Structure formats: C-alpha cells, structure tokens
C-alpha cells in the first residue's frame, strides 16, 4: 500500500490506473479523487442535535421564578426588574431554551415579521430598498421576509397568498401591476399593504414612490439641451407602471420642445435587465448610421449598463456617437467604464419610509392615517452624456 488508508482522520480515496474505485472499509467511494472526512461514531443528524425541546416551565424552575415572570421577560422585558431579567436569561442560556415563535404567533394572532415583495432583487436598486426597509424593521423589533416576483404577475400572486397565510404583520409591495381588488381583499382580512416605488390613485392605502414622470422629463430635457435630434427610449415591459411613467415624462419633454411624440424611438425590452440592455444595444448598433439615435434614455441603470457594454463591444463611442442616461443611480453607475449619467432615486429612504408607514398602521390601525410620500428625483450628469451638459447636477426641484 503506497498511501495510508487514513491521514489525520481523512480517508484517502485511491484509484487504480484504469480510473476505477478502490473501496475502503466504509464501502464504495466515488471516483472523483477528493478526500472525505467520516464521522467515526456515525450519528444521525437527529442524534447529533438531540430531540428534547426545553420549555418555559424548565426555565422558570431553574431561575426560581414563576412561569408568568419568564413570559414577561420574553414578551415585556421593560416591566421586569433588571436583576430578574438577568437571572432568567442565565437559565435560558444554560438550558438552551428557544421559544416557539409559531405558538406565540398563534396565541397573539400576529407576528414579528413583515413581508417584502420586490420586482427583481437581482437589481441593486431593489437591494438598496430592501436594506432600508430591513433597517427600519430591525429598529422596531421586526424581521423581514424577502420575496422576489422576478417581474412575473403569477409569481407575485403566489407570494402574496403565502405571506398572508403566514400572518405577517404587513406587506411591502413593489408590484408588477396594481390589482386594487386583490390588495383591498388582503387589507380587509387584516393585513396592511404599503406600495413601494409605485404610486396609487386610491386614498385607502399608503404608498412611497418617486415622481417618475418628472424623472423621465429631466432625463430627456438634458439630452435635448445638448442638441440631440434622434432620441430613443429603452425600456419594458410597459405593463410596469414605472416604465410607463418614465416614458410619459420623456414624451412630455419632447413635446414641450416642439417635437412630435413619434420622434422618440421606442426599443421595448421584455425585462429591466442587463441582458435586455445588451440586446437593445445590438438593435441600435445594427441600424444604419444615418438612422441610429444619437442619445438613449433607459428605464433603469441595468438596461443602460447593458447598452453601454454592447456599444463598447461594437465600437460605437459613448458619448461621442451615442449619449446614454439611465435611471436609479445604482452604485455601479459611477464605476462604469464610461461613468453613467442617471436619474437618482433615494433608494434606502424609499424602503425605510415604507416600512415605518407599514408598522405604524399595523401597530395602531385606529390612529393611522394613510399617507402618500413622493420623493423628487435628481439627474446626476456623468461622462456618458457629457456632450450635452457637464460638471453639474440638474435638480428636479429647480
């Protein structure tokens, strides 16, 4: 035997010259040539972790207090003397007690979780929104259950049903499409819903959003100020309200400048992703130079970055041949090969404000008044549209 069967507790899988396995004492092994450590005692997972759950009664006995005192330490620690809290906590730590949240939730009819259902958590914009919401929830003693609809209406519906079944304290929703009837039904059954990054005409709900019509307007106004004659809007699907609003703002800027709506070429994408931006870039690059737009406003930064990548690959210079403006001002925008001009949204503040409104309604519905919070966007000008305007920010409020 040229190799020991064991090296420091590791079983060595040995192979013959034909690539077959040499089975060790433990039986057959795979022929992938890696080392596998074996548990000599061969306990099951259940045996390793044990099966006996410690209850509150055991904690009370060990701490020398009543069951009610343990309950107060867990649920209302502010009314328990610090010395008693410490004694109960020592008993909890010694026994390894973990309270049954499901049972507590069943008794109370409420939970310490809020649902957060986003359009696309792979988009850094929604990641930042989620971070803001999570921070506000944590400060209030809640945790966040994060769900991703992937811009799919049926998937969104399944998650809404699941979150309601789990009796979350409330739902933060960035919807694919607003269904007033469905959301009204959820609210009537006792689960508050706050819309995030989406405006609503209903006065019976809270929402937190950005003025996307204004955002589209300032983006295209910026490009028109630079003398661009052939403009394109890149975005989709138009089922998503944010895309509609940003396009509407772009058209408003064009018409105000004395141009026709049909002078804004529309390149529709299936999704708001980097890959869709690259495909849009191929469409633009394949056009004859005399018909190719000289500026593009993209419905979000991922589309804009994908477009920028494809332009670079095809030898179309940005901004000399094509100026590009995105939307969201995600962290990657400033660090792109050609730093990307973008309409900035207060991403984390959107999430934080929405979570605060949701928890306010959930904890004191009889005092809550629905509010609409609309932030103003801001155009951040960088090199990708520098031919138009350079060296400053054009604030939407001006």
Question: Language-model segments: which ranges?
Answer:
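Short acidic capping loops at alpha-helix termini that bridge into adjacent secondary structure
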Residues: 229-231, 261-265, 317-324
């Amino acid at each position: 035997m040229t190799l020991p069967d064991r090296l420091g507790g590791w079983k060595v899988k040995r192979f013959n010259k034909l690539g077959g396995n040499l089975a060790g004492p433990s039986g057959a092994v795979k022929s992938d040539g890696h080392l596998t450590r074996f548990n000599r005692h061969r306990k099951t997972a259940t045996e390793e972790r044990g099966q006996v759950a410690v209850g509150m009664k055991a904690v009370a006995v060990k701490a020398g207090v009543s069951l009610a005192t343990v309950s107060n330490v867990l649920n209302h620690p502010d009314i328990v003397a610090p010395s008693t809290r410490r004694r109960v906590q020592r008993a909890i730590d010694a026994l390894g007690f973990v309270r049954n949240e499901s049972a507590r939730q069943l008794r109370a009819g409420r939970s310490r979780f809020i649902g957060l259902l986003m359009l696309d958590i792979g988009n850094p914009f929604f990641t930042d929104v989620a971070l803001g919401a999570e921070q506000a929830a944590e400060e209030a003693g809640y945790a966040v259950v994060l769900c991703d609809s992937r811009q799919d209406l049926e998937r969104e519906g399944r998650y809404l049903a699941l979150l309601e079944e789990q009796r979350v304290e409330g739902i933060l929703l960035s919807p694919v499409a607003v269904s007033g009837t469905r959301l009204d039904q959820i609210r009537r059954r006792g689960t508050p819903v706050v819309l995030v990054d989406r405006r609503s005409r209903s006065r019976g709900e809270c929402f937190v959003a950005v003025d996307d019509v204004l955002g589209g307007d300032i983006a295209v106004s910026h490009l028109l100020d630079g003398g661009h004659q052939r403009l394109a809007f890149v975005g989709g699907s138009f089922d998503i309200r944010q895309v509609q609003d940003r396009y509407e703002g772009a058209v408003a800027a064009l018409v105000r400048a004395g141009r026709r709506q049909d002078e804004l070429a529309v390149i529709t994408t299936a999704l708001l992703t980097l890959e869709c931006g690259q495909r849009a870039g191929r469409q633009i690059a394949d056009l004859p130079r005399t018909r190719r737009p000289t500026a593009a406003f993209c419905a979000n930064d991922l589309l804009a970055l994908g477009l920028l990548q494809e332009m670079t690959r095809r030898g179309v210079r940005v901004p000399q041949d094509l100026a590009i403006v995105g939307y969201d001002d995600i962290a990657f925008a400033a660090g792109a090969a050609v730093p990307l001009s973008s309409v900035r949204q207060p991403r984390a503040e959107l999430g934080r404000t929405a979570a605060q409104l949701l928890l306010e309604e959930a904890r004191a519905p009889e005092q809550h008044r629905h509010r609409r919070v609309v932030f103003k966007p801001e155009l951040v000008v960088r090199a990708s549209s520098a031919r138009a305007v350079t060296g400053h920010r054009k604030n939407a409020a001006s």
